A protein has these predicted regions:
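Bacterial N-terminal signal peptides
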Residues: 11-20
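Acidic/histidine-enriched alpha-helical segments
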Residues: 257-259, 329-347, 552-553, 594-597, ...
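Solvent-exposed coil/turn segments that connect beta secondary-structure elements
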Residues: 93, 102, 185-188, 198-200, ...
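C-terminal outer-membrane beta-barrel translocator/porin domains of Gram-negative envelope proteins
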Residues: 423-425, 435-447, 563-566, 573-697, ...
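Bacterial N-terminal signal peptides that target proteins for export
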Residues: 1-11
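Patatin-like phospholipase
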Residues: 24-78, 86-399, 403-410, 415-416, ...
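Gram-negative/organellar outer-membrane beta-barrel architecture
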Residues: 392-397, 406-577, 585, 649-656, ...
Length: 755
């Protein structure tokens, strides 16, 4: 079989093989029973319950069944049981099944946002404003709409599609090598829906695994379906309906919590779901006869959320299976007979992950009332006709489209093309709330003594204002740094990488002035700035942008407190600028890979101090290197300006242990080196926890007005510090302690990103 065979060819061969294999591939319940009667044995049904991570125990039980030589005639599985049971029914070998479970990247699967390296550069910039990736989304009528789930379903759907694509053409799951069915729950009526006829294996798994609140409901034939555990977590009756005479039931459901543990809203909500599940499980247990075998692994130490303990849970399942071995041997078949059955079960299944697909054409499935042109979706996917792509590469393309934030999920299918090629059909499911969104962000910083600062940011965006994807953003920030921004981002075409962005902004902030004789501030100024500009730029895919701008700026600085403050300064002038922003970091606050390069310059013929024109230029580069759990980080920055005090050093973010804004000047040189380790395994938190040390070197001085407004002149200053940080759902939280030589020691608490 050529390497480029398509899913359609595989499915056709599977169906042909199923029709030839006779008893091993019986379909209807009557055919199942007749085949078993012909062999003089009872029909064996395997029932696998739901239970989240506890469902990994099913793999261990299956290992024991294979060792004993038990032939399985039908499989019914719920939730996690549908994934394990469906994969086994489709032809996964035991090793493939185990490797699949052990190889899942659960951080990615359950991540609240796409990989940052795939996100559009505008969304990357939001990270530096401490804005969350999602917020309160609004319908076209202005009605607030909460998300359908806490976790995007994108990774789950891609995972299921990748693992089951060899049988995409099979729409009757009784025609799999082992007949299979999975219960789901109709979210509107509350009734059980049996996923077997007129559905793919992927659709059945997706519906049965749609945990309410965690994943969005599955859409099937116009209905909303959620986790089958709500109505039939241990589908014994379903297995009998499929033809089973004897049922091997594996129950891994979470038991009800004791009174002492119901002390918070999370525990109470979980108990409510478990109550519904427990009621239908008790009913199913009552349907077991003396011939049936119930296996209940000892999982008291594990919860449904222990997804990273799969190897341990599989072992518990195997242990429980061995305890039931004596009863299971009654159902065992001769080794030769079982081996022939297992070969027939697995021989037509070809894992699709590494199969290469030559792309003939890229299409977008039709969608009603879509506001996003198909050309834009295809351009974002970056799949070129004639290219050869693996499933992993096609998954990455779907993730790139999803990362724009306008879709509930983006999947795809491979239709047969001419001469063994594949037609990639993208299947984006657009959000109902892509019209506008509101997000709230902020930052907090304190030294537990004299200095505390807090900023609160409100941001509203109108999305997709025209077919080219325009966006109007407005931001208001209050706190230590008061700011207003309004900008209109307009791409210059559906697929062109060019854009234009007019904007206006106002900013006001106070800062201290230090003299040359000591560490105490001698004055406090308030600086205000108004800026209006038009930016013309070139987008570099997900990497960033380069652009030029023209605008008008008004700056004013006046004294608030202090003795003998410098004269008031005011400056107004038109200017032109250049901008470069390249960012592939995986995380802003705790990066482990990628890089960031920013450069910005502005020049004007007008001057402040009567010394020619006004020029400001700054470049910053940050590069992390990682090995296992360790990460080294290097950052460097250089600034040059004709404006005195344009750059500052000092505080928790620059030169830990020195006062905020301790040094300022028209020249800046700064570097830091950090070494950090992920210590999550030692902490009782789900969020990543980091501990690190760093050393900083920097200096800032004036070359315009002399050194009268900055202490230390051109001297280099050194700081050493240590920190512990948590990358939490509400943003980075960090505790830092450090010392700047010759200045002092400081302890700081920080929440949110701070430059």
């Amino acid at each position: 079989m050529p390497e480029r065979r398509t899913s359609a060819v595989l499915a056709a061969l599977a169906l042909l093989g199923l029709s030839i294999a006779g008893a091993a591939y019986a379909k209807t319940p009557d055919e199942v029973r007749a085949a078993c009667r012909a062999e003089g044995r009872p029909c064996v049904g395997l029932v696998l319950s739901g239970g989240g991570a506890r469902g990994f125990a099913h793999v261990g039980v299956i290992r024991v069944l294979e060792e004993l030589g038990v032939k399985i005639d039908v499989i019914a599985g719920t939730s996690m049981g549908s994934m394990v049971g469906g994969a086994y029914a489709a032809g996964f070998t035991l090793s493939e099944l185990e490797n699949t479970v052990l190889g899942v990247d659960w951080d990615r699967m359950l991540g609240p946002r796409p990989d940052r390296q795939l996100v559009n550069w505008r969304r990357k910039l939001d990270d530096y404003k401490s804005l969350p990736s999602s917020g309160l989304e609004m319908s076209h009528e202005g009605t607030p709409m909460l998300p359908a789930a806490f976790v995007p379903s994108e990774e789950l759907e891609l995972f299921l599609a990748r693992k089951t694509s060899a049988f995409d053409m099979v729409r009757d799951l009784s025609r799999l090598p082992v007949p299979f069915a999975a219960p789901a729950t109709n979210l509107v009526t509350g009734y059980r829906v049996v996923m077997q006829k007129d559905c793919t294996l992927r659709e059945a798994m997706r519906a049965s695994m749609s945990i309410p609140g965690a994943f969005s409901p599955a859409q099937y034939k116009g209905e909303l379906l959620v986790d089958g555990g709500l109505v039939d977590n241990l589908p014994v009756e379903l297995a009998r309906e499929m033809g089973a005479d004897v049922v091997i039931a594996v129950n891994v459901g979470t038991p009800l919590s004791e009174k002492e543990k119901l002390t918070n809203v999370v525990g109470v909500m979980a108990q409510m779901v478990n109550l519904l599940t427990e009621q239908n499980v008790r009913k199913s247990l009552g349907e077991l006869s003396s011939r049936d075998i119930l296996i209940t692994p000892d999982l008291a130490e594990y919860s449904s959320a222990d997804l990273k303990k799969s190897a341990e849970i599989i072992a518990r399942g195997e242990e429980a299976g061995r305890k039931a071995a004596e009863r299971l041997r009654v159902l065992a078949r001769p080794k030769v007979e079982w081996a022939a059955w297992n070969k027939a079960r697995t021989e037509l299944f070809d894992p699709p992950e590494k199969r290469k697909n030559r792309v003939y054409e890229v299409l977008v499935a039709e969608s009603k009332n879509s506001r996003i042109p198909p050309e834009r979706t295809i351009e974002r996917a970056a799949i070129r006709p004639g290219s050869v792509r693996t499933r992993g590469e096609l998954d990455a393309a779907a993730r790139s489209v999803f990362a724009d934030g306008y879709f509930e999920s983006v999947t795809y299918r491979l239709d047969p093309g001419p001469d063994g090629t594949s037609v990639v059909v993208l299947e984006p499911r657009e959000k109902d709330s892509v019209w506008s969104s509101v997000r709230f962000g902020g930052s907090l910083e304190t030294d537990f003594d004299k200095v505390s600062s807090f900023n609160f940011l409100f941001a509203h965006s109108w999305h997709l204002l025209n077919s080219w994807g325009a966006e109007w953003r407005n931001e208001i920030q209050i706190g230590e740094r008061q700011r207003f921004l309004s900008e209109f981002y307009q791409p210059l075409g559906t697929t062109l990488p060019l854009f234009i962005q007019p904007s206006i902004s106002f900013e006001r902030q106070s800062y201290d002035i230090y003299g040359t004789e000591g560490k105490q501030a001698i004055a406090r100024w308030r600086a205000t700035q108004f800026d209006s500009q038009v930016l013309f730029g070139w987008e570099m895919a997900r990497l960033g942008y380069a652009g030029i701008s023209a605008g008008w700026i008004s700056m004013r600085a006046k004294p608030e407190i202090g003795r003998d403050p410098p004269p008031q300064e005011r400056y107004e002038a038109p200017y032109i600028g250049a901008h470069l922003f390249l960012d592939t970091l995986d995380n802003v606050s705790f990066p482990t890979k990628g890089y960031r390069l920013t450069a910005e310059g502005r020049t004007s013929d007008e001057n402040i101090d009567g010394r020619g024109g006004t020029h400001v230029f700054k470049v910053n580069v940050l590069v992390p290197w990682s090995r296992e759990k360790w990460t080294a980080l290097l950052e460097a920055e250089i600034g040059r300006s004709t404006v005195s005090g344009a750059f500052q050093l000092g505080g928790a973010s620059r030169m830990v242990g020195s006062p905020y804004g301790r040094w300022s000047g028209s020249r800046l040189e700064y570097a830091r080196f950090a070494l950090a380790r992920n210590i999550s395994e030692f902490m009782p938190l789900e969020a990543p926890v980091w501990a690190g040390v760093q050393t900083e070197f920097g200096r800032a001085w004036n070359s315009v007005m002399g050194d009268d407004l900055t202490s230390g002149g051109r001297d280099w200053h050194k700081s050493v510090s240590a920190y512990v940080g948590v990358d939490s759902l509400i943003g980075p939280v960090m505790l830092t302690v450090g010392r700047t030589m010759g200045e002092g020691t400081g302890i700081y608490f920080l929440w949110g990103y701070r430059e």
